[in-house]
Amino acid sequence: MDIRKAYLDFFASKGHEITPSSPLVPDDATLLFANAGMVPFKSIFTGEIPRPNPPRKTSCQTCIRAGGKHNDLDNVGYTARHHTFFEMLGNFSFGDYFKEQAIAYAWEFVTEVLKLPKDRLYVTVHENDDEAFNLWQKHIQKERIYKFGDKDNFWQMGDTGPCGPCSEIFYDQGEEHFNSSEDYMGGDGDRFLEIWNLVFMQYERSADGVLSPLPKPSIDTGMGLERVTAIKEGKFSNFDSSLFMPIINEISKLCNKTYIYESGASFRVIADHIRSSVFLLAQGVSFDKEGRGYVLRRILRRALRHGYLLGFKQAFMYKLVDIVCDLMGGHYTYLNEKKDFIKEQIRLEEERFLSTIENGIEIFNEELKNTKEIFSGEVAFKLYDTYGFPLDLTADMLREKNLKVDEEKFELLMNEQKARAKASWKGSGDKTASGDFKNLLEKFGENHFVGYEKAECESKILALLDEDFKEVSTLKDAGWVMLENTPFYATSGGQSADSGFIAKREVLDTQKFFNLNLSFVKAGEELKVGDIVHARIDTEKREQIARHHSATHLLHHALREILGSHVSQAGSLVESNKLRFDFTHHKALNKEELESIEKRVNEMIINSSEAILENMPLEEAKKSGAIALFNEKYQGNVRVLTLGESKELCGGTHVKNTAQIGSFYIVKESGVSAGVRRIEAVVSKAALEFVKNQLEELSKVKDELKNNDILNGVKKLKNEILSLKNELKNSSKTELDSKNIQGVEICVKRIDNGDIKAMIDDFKNKFAKAVILLIQVKDEKITLAAGVKDAPLKAGALVKEAAQILGGNGGGRDDFATAGGKDLSKINEALKQSLETIEKAL
């Protein structure tokens, strides 16, 4: 049974509009990831945006709980129902139906669609919610309805705002399968399993804690797909269901080990974590050192450590991407489009970590011998800083030994590192708007953007705010103006804001707060609320912004055409004199690729394609082939821009014909983070300025070379430099002192100049048997290298021992190895220890 489809179809038949899952990265600064079904509708529940039409929605929302307030990462694999990635089925009413219909719908779906036995179902309500208690008695015996307090049956979004009692449906998995003393309704056992939560949002909680009835109460429900699938299939663990077992079977095949539930935590961790990794990468999150990208890295590295326990010593996670796409690509079709890109990203990240995991585990095990209860915070930090072990990975390894890590010491060292990194940084931070925009929204509604059609207009001033966002009736100083109709485009979707004039006041910026367009003006003549003023934009700036914005669409199309369909927008900045476009791709672009992209964009410009703008429902737009961005929030009808072969959802300002863009030049290509590249480019007047500057630079080079043939002049210079380098290399060879032990020539020394590898090679060539270790310091950076020739030592082990004394690490072949170090104060100690090691071996 396709429960996901059955659920959505059921509520569609009850007048609910099916809403596609919103991005895992929400348009909400308070959330790391979408972690519940109601996240896309939060602004509706809080009144920030008007109620939709129809006021009933249903969805299957993809969710991540790994990091932030809601973090299930540590429990995944060890319990039957915790996941980092899951799907939440939900139905929502925004001031439409309330408790009676919500309860009736839930009961009908559970008993008639899912066909769960009624004698296995129980219900809970809030102890003071007599209305829900009485309504439930129409469907289920009174004895099966339990009352609980705020802890279990009251839901609120935050300390203030919409809230209300909730009612939960439980499923009895059978007394015969469970024997815990907690296996009763309200207990912590696993026998009675909550499958659906119905939230009755009927109150508004004020800052002083007072509950006031909402004029139009709402419904928010959530049912975990993984949990209800396991119940429907008669499984006691989500991991035993058809959503996970194909992945677990594939892991079993790859490692040639049989999966047994009781000892299969590592299988379950990997099966869960590959799902979250695939979805996060598909939606534009990339591996990084901070933020969401670091959560993704933590998830994958935790899975790799469990893979190590199963015997995987080489990259393997990327081989599981196919089975995830097979299982879920039918509903989430974008997975198939990004499959190859996802596999490559995971493989590269695996190889990054696998190169250090063995050394890290070795250090972990050594410290474990000295640990009784608390694992050293210093060693945990070293594992993080040097070997890439996230703290929760170390904690997970310790959990298996019933030990804990000294998190306080770890955080102290982490903060010290951050302080050092920021020692030279000074700044005041962002000023936070403190105005009550919600009141303005309730008073006036959204003001109207007329800038698509008009560059100037007469408009009424609805509100004025000072620089601290406090409402004022008159304004002479700098501040914010809210016009009834505004031609000024607010910063949005990467496009920078318009500038211009309101009356005689210069507009420097326009921003959107709670869907209100507010323009920031310089100090000047007095403005009053209610004034009718003339507003006009800087049309020259608008046109240049439009040219650069349209060019980003052509660039996006060219990237997908030349590099592959895995490319998606990961960020953009559009200004009047440049554009910046971030996109998903696993490696730097070569010269040929950049030339092809630049050429393709210019071809599309020359084709003189008319811009076609259409408004249509989101689903219709997607079916037409329009590209939607994962990090954008779309509601109701969307605006679709077609420029030749490019077709995207976009709310920005654009040219009427691609020919207006002029010419397109790529200025720079660079990396932003793992799996994300950036192209900076210019068009129109900025492109002409760029070419002019390039020609001027070439002219200066020609003058410096005193040669009209620039290319040959540069080649001649390069040959001269190479010749001088060789002379310097030969002149800098240092005569190395050595001594002979048992017929083996030994040299252990610090050097300041010369090519360290060349010196080791020269030393080994002079003698039949040789052992040499050199430490070189340049710009406070320590480099170690060792060489062995026909002697009972290994260069890799020798250099590793010395590097660890210096706070670094390294290795290599038995005959030659290199390493790096950090602690300059311990160089003599490292040299002494290395000499002792060599002498003992001989």
Curated annotation (Swiss-Prot):
Cofactor comment text: Binds 1 zinc ion per subunit.
Top EC class for this record: ligase
Positions bound to Zn(2+): 549, 553, 650, 654
Catalytic activity as recorded in UniProt: tRNA(Ala) + L-alanine + ATP = L-alanyl-tRNA(Ala) + AMP + diphosphate
Enzyme Commission code(s) on record: 6.1.1.7
A GO biological-process term: negative regulation of DNA-templated transcription
GO CC annotations on file: cytosol
Main location: cytoplasm
InterPro entries, sorted: aa-tRNA-synth_II/BPL/LPL, Ala-tRNA-lgiase_IIc, Ala-tRNA-ligase_IIc_anticod-bd, Ala-tRNA-synth_IIc_core, Ala-tRNA-synth_IIc_N, Ala-tRNA_ligase, Ala_tRNA_ligase_euk/bac, DHHA1_dom
Compartment(s) of residence: Cytoplasm
Single GO MF annotation: alanine-tRNA ligase activity
Cofactor(s) needed by this chain: Zn(2+)
Keyword Metal-binding: yes
HAMAP family given in the database record: Ala_tRNA_synth_B (MF_00036_B)
Function: Catalyzes the attachment of alanine to tRNA(Ala) in a two-step reaction: alanine is first activated by ATP to form Ala-AMP and then transferred to the acceptor end of tRNA(Ala). Also edits incorrectly charged Ser-tRNA(Ala) and Gly-tRNA(Ala) via its editing domain.
Xref: NCBIfam families: alaS
Name recorded for this polypeptide: Alanine--tRNA ligase
Organism: Campylobacter jejuni subsp. jejuni serotype O:23/36 (strain 81-176)
